[in-house]
Amino acid sequence: MEFVWDERKRKSNIKKHGFDFIDAEQVFNGATFTIVDDRLNYHEDRFITLGMLEDVVVVIAHTEEEDIIRIISIRKATKNEQKIYFKGFSY
């Protein structure tokens, strides 16, 4: 997989959320939970992935096309999103 992003959006995300898009690959190499983001009509297929970045559950908004993942944002998961993530792996 190749990871791409808009550099201005990356810098904005670091300031706003404290997470760097460069670290997205680390999240996707671990255990993840992905759903389709159909909250709005984005004119493209968007996904929300929950995963671990070091010891923090994060939410990554992204698109996927062939072998390319375009990162839109990364932020710390809310308490509810953390529950969803951990519940998904506790059968």
Residue ranges and their predicted role:
Residues M1-Y91:
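Ribonuclease/tRNase effector modules and their secretory precursors
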